[in-house]
Amino acid sequence: MKRIFVPLLLLLSLACKEKQKAPLTAQEIVDKSIEDSGGKLYEDHKTFFEFRDRKYVSENNNGKKVLKRIFKVDSVTITDVKTGNDFQRFMNDSLVAVSDSIATKYANSVNSVHYFARLPYGLNDPAVKKELLGKETIEGKRYHKIKVTFDQNGGGEDYDDVYVYWFDVENFKPMYLAYSFHVDGGGQRFRKAYNERYVNGIRFVDYDNYKPKDKDSDILQIGQLFNKEELELLSKIELTDIKVEQD
């Protein structure tokens, strides 16, 4: 009886270990990353920061995400407000008319800055499609590599852009990202996060912003191009005066 019982225990133990080693899905990796970066705090906290001499505010109003950009032109204070798919521009608190084409351009600009500042939170938006590409080594460390595309319905004007994210295999923090785009002649960008800090529980980073030397490079190979020093530094993406408050 003992001879049967002992092997049975060994089989059960091995089965449990195999279950524990089941590979993570793209969704699980993103969920863990969001939890580490702020989790539910994104949903009930207002954030403020400055980027290139403009102020940005993100808040939640009756369940809707409201994104703002505030800056001055001479003595006029301009406030751009994106609520869902709606856009409004105020000049010294007075609403001004903006053509649909210009409103779309301004709304995309506001959304883009907030999107990168709030990462990885936006990666669970309904239009996002995630695909785990495996693991990749960048600068000597291993990362989960996830490709992100968007549904045309709800994916915005740039729904056909392709993004790639690299998440640390140990702590799930997104340390690198890349994307291809089609506006203004198109191109690719690769960003390396640095200067990580948590403000009232929400993670913020700055980025070194690179582009490939070869404009026809494959976006899925851009991590290895970075390893080979085949990217050139374009700019630094730096957020200042960050504040986080409960709504």
Where are these regions (language model features)?
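Short, hydrophobic/aromatic-rich segments at coil-to-beta transitions
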Residues: 42-48, 62-69, 140-147, 174-176, ...
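N-terminal, post-signal-peptide region of Sec/Tat-exported proteins
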Residues: 51-79
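Mid-chain, structured segments of secreted extracytoplasmic proteins
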Residues: 69-101
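Extended lipid/amphipathic-ligand handling interfaces
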Residues: 33, 58-60, 194-196
